Amino acid sequence: MPRRLDVLDAPVRLTHDGGELLARAGEPLLLSLLVGKGFVLSRSPKLHRPRGPYCLRGACEGCLVRVDGVPNLMACQTLAAEGQKVETQNVIGSRKLDVLEATDYLFPRGMDHHRLFAGVRGVSALVQAFARRVSGLGRLADHAEPPREAKRLEIDVLVVGGGTAGLSAAAELGARGLLADDQLALGGALRVLDPPRAEALVRRARASGCKLRPRTSVIGLYVEDRERALTALLVGPEGAISVSARRVVLAPGSHDPVPLFENNDLPGVMSARAALSLLRQGVLVGERVAVVGDGRFAAHFVEASSELATSTLLDSEMVLSAHGKPSVSSVKVRAGSIERRLRVDAVIVDGPAPPAFELGVQAGGTTRFVPERGYLLELDAERRVAPHVFAAGSAAGSSDSEEDGKGAARVALASL
């Protein structure tokens, strides 16, 4: 079970399913949930399999909870505060013992709810009514939030992504740029790999005069007038913002790799980047950790936790399956013709990270497949993905994100 490595000073008190938890004000709510309740935080919509956090970046559904009557909030992106009421969603029973988990055993090959008992007189209507009651995630909010009018901004250059490439681009753009990133803090991968360097990049970008907006997702990039500007839809703490940008620099980074073994969705299986992020924030995922695959995040985790946990390094091809109820407690591995089980508290996964190409494609760009990397955005000689849209960093296949970000910003400015 995850545990804290430090003592909470002046903690805030909140409740989770009626039980009291202690947290540090302003930290991600997920930390106190993991330490106080373990890895299982919710259930999947259809088969009600146990769910836990995988990425800690708001990109998976493993930490969705109801907070103060508001459904489907990501605990990794929600800040802990005094008096919060946190509730588990999508269970009949409890997080660890959900009655509807039986569907996972009754339908081992999956359930086609569209045809289940279809046409059976007297039964079909009952099944449909029940399915509608238990489907979906969460219940409507206790109180509807009044609508807020979207703000509108016009800028020269919008930078998407607050990692090394994005911050480097922002520093070049200065007051002519606006940077949006969906994380609680700027810095991207450097935030966990090299925190001091991440802080230095943030300070440099802020000193340049560039407007920095953490906790702000760019959820759409629309080509409405190729001769003048693109429209980006941003969503953050202030609500929706419609941004008209003459140029866009995409630096969204990469997604966490997905492990390819049976039961890879068990709570306690997470990315090495997520485990390292927890460690940087004072939470250890477990005393016995299986490290599957290799990469920067796995290497840093093993080094940083060497005196706190026992790490077992495994090639990704060795791992056959994860086991445990309701969270992972062992992995089955194969070396040659020999299979055995290893007892673990957590499984962390690293490896080639899939580039985040989605916004580039939405803006009209194309991708190319590189076997060892995945689908990368296709660039021309000036880093252009589509008219008025440039890309930098790992999404573009760069090996030097800092210089790549600077270069993309310079080209974007020169094209105005």
Give the ranges of each region predicted by the language model:
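Residues forming the flavin
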Residues: P2-V12, A25-M74, L79-L416
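Short, contiguous acidic and Ser/Thr-rich linear segments
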Residues: D17-E27
